[in-house]
């Protein structure tokens, strides 16, 4: 999709300094995340790209809380299904009980995302956000993922909720999406158009 007429777009930030920062982007998910505060877990930029300006990954405490919640849920379900606590004597049931929370724990620990002035990366890959050719939102429930593909074949995806948990990260990505839409022929699916590009939710106030 490209624009039929001239449109005044926000300026592109400098690849090294990130200035000027893009204007605040509209959000679909207005709930705050639980970001990691340990700078030692800050992702690195893709090879040959400018510095990381913003990043997000769930905090360790959030991951541990999620593990405990899922473990407790599986414990309750196991007791209900077996009609009591007799299953606790069977090691096979313990393996089944632990499988789901362990897998969720490992998945959550490995997920991250970062943005520079003109790129976005996650644990699934990276793209040049001003050279996008495809913007799609897919997935059901409360955690749909935004899939991005650029002109060089780069591709990545991440949960929209997490991308928008860091407003400044989302500002960078959204600015690249809007520029791509007005300068390139970009394939956009209906879900992305409604929930990302034409979203009508109020903008969230910055919290510095």
Located regions from the model:
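N-terminal membrane-targeting/pre-transmembrane regions
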Residues: 1-81, 204-208
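Residue-level marker of positions within ordered structural domains that often coincide
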Residues: 6, 137, 178
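Hydrophobic H-region at the start of alpha-helical membrane spans
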Residues: 65-70, 90-96
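Hydrophobic, well-ordered secondary-structure segments
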Residues: 73-80, 97-99, 150, 158, ...
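Membrane interfacial helix motifs at helix-loop boundaries and amphipathic/re-entrant anchors
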Residues: 76-94
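Conserved beta-hairpin
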Residues: 91-138
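Acidic, Ser/Thr-rich low-complexity segments on the non-lumenal side of membrane proteins
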Residues: 122-165
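A membrane-cytosol interface segment of integral membrane proteins
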Residues: 151-208
């Amino acid at each position: 999709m490209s624009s039929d007429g001239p449109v005044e777009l926000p300026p592109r930030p400098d690849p090294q300094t990130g200035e000027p920062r893009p204007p605040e982007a509209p959000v679909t998910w207005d709930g705050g995340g639980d970001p990691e505060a340990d700078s030692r877990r800050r992702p690195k930029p893709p090879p040959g790209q400018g510095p990381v300006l913003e990043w997000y990954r769930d905090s360790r405490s959030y991951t541990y809380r999620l593990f405990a919640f899922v473990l407790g849920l599986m414990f309750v379900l196991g007791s209900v299904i077996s009609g009591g606590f007799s299953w606790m004597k069977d090691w096979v049931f313990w393996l089944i009980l632990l499988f789901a929370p362990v897998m969720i724990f490992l998945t959550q620990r490995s997920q991250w995302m970062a943005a520079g002035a003109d790129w976005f990366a996650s644990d699934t890959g990276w793209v040049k956000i001003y050279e996008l050719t495809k913007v799609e939102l897919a997935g059901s429930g409360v955690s749909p993922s935004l899939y991005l593909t650029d002109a060089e074949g780069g591709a990545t995806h991440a949960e929209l909720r997490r991308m928008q948990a860091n407003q400044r990260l989302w500002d960078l990505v959204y600015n690249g999406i809007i520029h791509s839409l007005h300068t390139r022929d970009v394939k956009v699916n209906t879900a992305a158009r409604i929930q990302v590009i034409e979203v009508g939710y109020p903008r969230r106030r910055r919290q510095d």
